[in-house]
A protein has these predicted regions:
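Interfacial helix-loop-helix junctions of multi-pass membrane proteins
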Residues: 80-86, 150-164
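Interfacial aromatic-anchored transmembrane helix boundaries in multi-pass membrane proteins
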Residues: 34-45, 73-107
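Short helix-perturbing small/polar motifs within transmembrane alpha-helices
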Residues: 2-8, 17-24, 31, 92, ...
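Alpha-helical transmembrane segments and their cytosolic interface
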Residues: 2-23, 161-193
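Small-polar-interrupted transmembrane alpha-helices in polytopic inner-membrane proteins
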Residues: 25-29, 65-80, 147
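Hydrophobic transmembrane alpha-helices
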Residues: 2-66
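Alpha-helical transmembrane segments and their helix-entry boundary regions
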Residues: 65-69, 101, 132, 162
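Membrane-water interface at transmembrane helix exits
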Residues: 33-37, 76, 111, 115-119, ...
Length: 193
């Protein structure tokens, strides 16, 4: 007697793969949050999170790159220790780092949209260095625009003080993160994995 079974795909293979990649990059940003350095001229520490934001946008594109950072924020808000130095909870999303955190999905989407010239992923070998660097500079502007606004709101800082403490103080570190991201993209390490 033959048994007839039918299977129903609730989620396509491509969607499942993209969701898994988004979760992986959310975890990467969370791991990078543990790498912190005090910044003597800012109330906010330097972390490697922004490097993860750049990489999410570059490798996943604007849609899934942004989604990965929404997943990251949700995990942290629900108690996963993925924010700066292993902190967690919704309070982080309304505290002094709130502007930076809320900017991450937008910045990843912007970086991905510039690198891929839209929502469809393209071969990263065809992306020129000026486009790659320009996308990350634009992502940095988004992150520090949100971050400065958050510092002004939460800490009642004036615009000049907020820009000095919330953006200018981080520019050397951001240049290094951009260089690191270029190194990762231009190496064949990710493609080989």
């Amino acid at each position: 007697m033959a048994t007839n079974t039918e299977s129903v795909d609730l989620v396509g293979d491509e969607a499942a793969t993209n969701l898994a990649r988004a979760a992986l990059f959310a975890a990467l940003v969370g791991a990078f949050a543990y790498v912190t350095f005090p910044n003597p001229v800012s109330p906010v520490d330097v972390t490697l999170q922004v490097l993860g934001v750049f990489l999410a946008g570059i490798f996943l594109g604007p849609v899934w790159g942004g989604a990965s950072l929404v997943l990251y924020l949700a995990a942290g808000a629900l108690g996963a220790p993925v924010f700066e130095g292993g902190s967690a909870g919704f309070g982080q999303l309304v505290g002094q780092t709130a502007g930076y955190l809320w900017s991450y999905p937008v910045a990843a989407a912007v970086v991905g949209a510039v690198v891929h010239r839209g929502a469809t992923l393209r071969d990263l070998d065809s992306v020129g260095l000026p486009t790659l660097v320009g996308a990350m500079v634009l992502g940095t502007v988004v992150i520090y625009g949100f971050g400065v606004a958050g510092l002004m709101l939460v800490l009642s800082l004036g615009p000049i003080e907020a820009i000095a403490a919330g953006a200018a103080a981080f520019l050397p570190a951001e240049a290094l993160k951009i260089a690191a991201a270029v190194g990762v993209v231009r190496s064949d390490a990710i493609a080989a994995a």
